[in-house]
């Protein structure tokens, strides 16, 4: 899958990421440069289950959900590589995150993730989310790759009480 046929639609994204509705937050991938950068689209609709709404305020996409969308775009870039197809990606941390503006139903968010550092099992990505020409969120994310294997997930307690 070194050369992807763009744009990647929802079905193609489902072949790369393990996420499914309602938590698959990327609608389309429009640009892809392996190990360098990727651009994805998230169209925010009024039907999103997770829209936050305070009395008197317009509904908006929670910043945590926007952060997850950015992480998913970055994960697509990493997991699309043939050698990573059977692996899982774990985001270990986010740093220097800034939320600049709320995202509302009707907005189309363009998410760009670029590689800051990439090693065989770890890396750092920089993500920027925009609505039109305005940056709505940005930050860096550290991730690790792990093999799918015994079915254990981080934090699972095994017999004997060990994680």
What do the predicted segments below correspond to?
Residues 2-5, 18, 34, 103-105, ...:
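HotDog/MaoC-like acyl-thioester-processing domains
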Residues 21-61:
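Catalytic strand-loop segment that frames the active site of acyl-thioester-processing enzymes
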Residues 27-30, 95, 100, 112-116, ...:
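Conserved positions in beta-strands of structured domains
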Residues 14, 57, 99-101:
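Beta-strand-rich interaction surfaces with strong enrichment in secreted/lumenal proteins
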Residues 8-20:
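Short aromatic-glycine motifs in intrinsically disordered, low-complexity regions
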Residues 23-25, 109, 123:
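Hydrophobic core residues within well-ordered beta-strands of beta-rich domains
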Residues 52-78, 91-92:
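Compact, glycine-rich, soluble single-domain proteins
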Residues 2-7, 74-112, 136-144:
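Hydrophobic beta-strand-centered segment that forms part of the acyl-chain substrate-binding groove
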């Amino acid at each position: 899958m070194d050369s992807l046929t763009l744009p990647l639609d929802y079905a193609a994204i489902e072949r790369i990421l393990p996420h499914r509705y309602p938590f698959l937050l990327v609608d389309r991938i429009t640009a892809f440069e392996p190990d360098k950068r990727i651009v994805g689209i998230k169209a925010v609709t009024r039907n999103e289950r997770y829209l936050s709404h305070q009395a008197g305020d317009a509904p908006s996409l929670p910043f945590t959900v926007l952060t997850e969308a950015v992480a998913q775009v970055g994960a697509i870039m990493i997991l699309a590589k043939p050698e990573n197809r059977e692996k899982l990606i774990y985001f270990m941390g986010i740093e220097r995150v800034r939320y600049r503006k709320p995202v509302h139903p009707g907005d189309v968010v363009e998410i760009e993730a670029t590689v800051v550092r990439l090693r065989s099992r770890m890396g750092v990505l920089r993500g920027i989310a925009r609505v039109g020409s305005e940056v709505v969120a940005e930050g860096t994310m550290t991730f690790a790759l792990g093999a799918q294997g015994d079915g254990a997930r981080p934090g699972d307690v095994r017999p004997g009480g060990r994680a």
